[in-house]
Amino acid sequence: MTQRVFQVWKGSNKFILGGRLIFGPDARSLPLTLLLIIVPVVLFCVFVARHLRHEFSPYNAGYAIMVVAILFTIYVLILLFFTSARDPGIVPRNSHPPEEDLRYETTVSADGRQTPSVQIPRTKEVIVNGVSVRVKYCDTCMLYRPPRCSHCSICNNCVERFDHHCPWVGQCIGLRNYRYFFMFVSSSTLLCIYIFSMSAVYIKILMDHQQATVWRAMKESPWAVVLMIYCFIALWFVGGLTAFHLYLISTNQTTYEKLRYRSSHSRSIVYNRGCPNNFLEVFCSKVKPSRNNFRAFIEEEPPRVITLPSTTRESGEAEDENVTRRQKVEDDLDIGDDLMNLSRRCNAEDANNNQPHHTLDIDHERAGSIRTEARHESWGRRSGSWDVAATDVRESRSYATAKDGRG
């Protein structure tokens, strides 16, 4: 059965609706984020906004307080969805290393054997805005990362313009969702300010109606106090995050670049086009389409053959030929040794029986070519070095010459 891309995806992402929505592996944190947004708004509508409906006349303008809170919350949730449920800019991984960047090297072992090997350069230089930038090779995705791209260890993907991995949205923040992430954080900041302000207004109204002190008014509406405390604490996080990313956008940096290259001034100015253009690039440029079609069917890739360079291939063929020749010399020497031992044994038996041996009678011419010296240590070797002693080669040649002379 043919499978789709999302079914065999090698990253750690989670897909729903047949690969139409993509989340990070920690998407289970999303319900907590939803509760932190929805619960305070519900409490605000029930215990604060409901009592302010008739406080602003004419035209019952107090109803607008509740409507604004609800619409603002829906807007924040939509931004959260766009941030966490879409491709952040994942670079498609390769099934094999890029052939145009392969380097073929030959290593020589201790016994003289040459072994060809394939190497991948760890880095290479590219030019960005007239500045040389070093990009790294990713062993997991088997590709050279584009500039400003980094590999997320949580999602196990290379992400373009990688900013960071946010556990609150359960997704990487990259090229295709950074705009929505910033809008989500900044809108959450405004929502906190709105709820805090309206809760404070409600306490002020209670003070005016009852001619009471602030402490008595707070006692009359404890939920308003709880909402003010909650929003004050949340503002330190989302408000600080909004301010930090405003600075990053103005200088066209990412969180990853700011933390890693904080001491490199040249790195920070490579992509800086000026504050107005930097904001236009983030908020007004068209969002690039995804480079992955997660619902596409997988096509079987034909077998891949790596062709070694001619020099490597010729050296390998020469090595095989030398090995064959050495093996032949060793085999010839072993056969000659066995024949000599057989001849000695037969002559000894004939001498004991006082009978001439006709089939293995050795004439004087042939006797000179048979070796009677001690057995060399290189004879009979089956493993180890392929080197053959020079004396063995000379004796083999002399034996072959004598044999040809008799023929």
Curated annotation (Swiss-Prot):
Keyword Heme: no
Tissue expression from the record: Expressed in flowers and pollen.
Its EC number(s): 2.3.1.225
Phosphoserine found at: S385
Segments forming domain DHHC: 136-186
Keyword Phosphoprotein among record annotations: yes
Annotated TM spans: 29-49, 62-82, 181-201, 224-244
InterPro entries: Palmitoyltrfase_DHHC (IPR001594), PFA4/ZDH16/20/ERF2-like (IPR039859)
Compartment annotation: Cell membrane
Membrane topology of the entry: Multi-pass membrane protein
UniProt entry keywords in alphabetical sequence: Acyltransferase, Cell membrane, Lipoprotein, Membrane, Palmitate, Phosphoprotein, Transferase, Transmembrane, Transmembrane helix
One GO molecular-function entry: protein-cysteine S-palmitoyltransferase activity
Active site: C166 (s-palmitoyl cysteine intermediate)
Domain statement: The DHHC domain is required for palmitoyltransferase activity.
Function noted in UniProt: S-acyltransferase involved in protein lipid modification.
Record-stated family: Belongs to the DHHC palmitoyltransferase family.
Protein name: Protein S-acyltransferase 8
Native source organism of the sequence: Arabidopsis thaliana (Mouse-ear cress)
